[in-house]
Amino acid sequence: HAQGGLPIPDITHIVQHYWYQVGGADSPERPGIKMAQALEQKINELGEHRVAAYIAEPIQGAGGVVIPPDTYWPEISDICRRYQILLVADEVICGFGRTGKWFGSDYYNIQPDLMPIAKGLSSGYLPIAAVMVADHVSQVLIEEGGEFFHGMTYSGHPAACAVACANVRILRDEKIIDRVDTVT
């Protein structure tokens, strides 16, 4: 964010999972855990009552396709569960088979609380986006939030939704994601 700053108050960052920069001759497992533990250090620094969520891409696309060590995401997930912090896996880039699994989260065997999805939902044929919400989060919205206003003028366009449904059906029925997993 050095180029433009981040104008939203109360958003903070932790170190990125560039294990190849900090690991040296070490295996990626130890740096993966160490970098994930930066989240716990930040939680303790800020106070756990001030941290609502951890948001990240399973594989960081914006940073140049940065693949984390296998130990990184399970440790992040454990920390989020321990402190009751929402885990948000941004699946806009990793979703819908790009890792050989339906989602990058599946690749790392983690269960996010929220998953923003977009491009892969329609394979880019029409613009569409959504947020997948875990049952325990949606239940809070239902019980505590009353009405959840989320429909805007151009949201839920029938053509984009039809393309998304057809695309997901094709990915599933033609086992395209399975082929990505075995061929690449």
Name each region found by the language model.
Residues H1-T184:
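Conserved N-terminal phosphate-binding loop of PLP-dependent enzymes in the Aspartate aminotransferase
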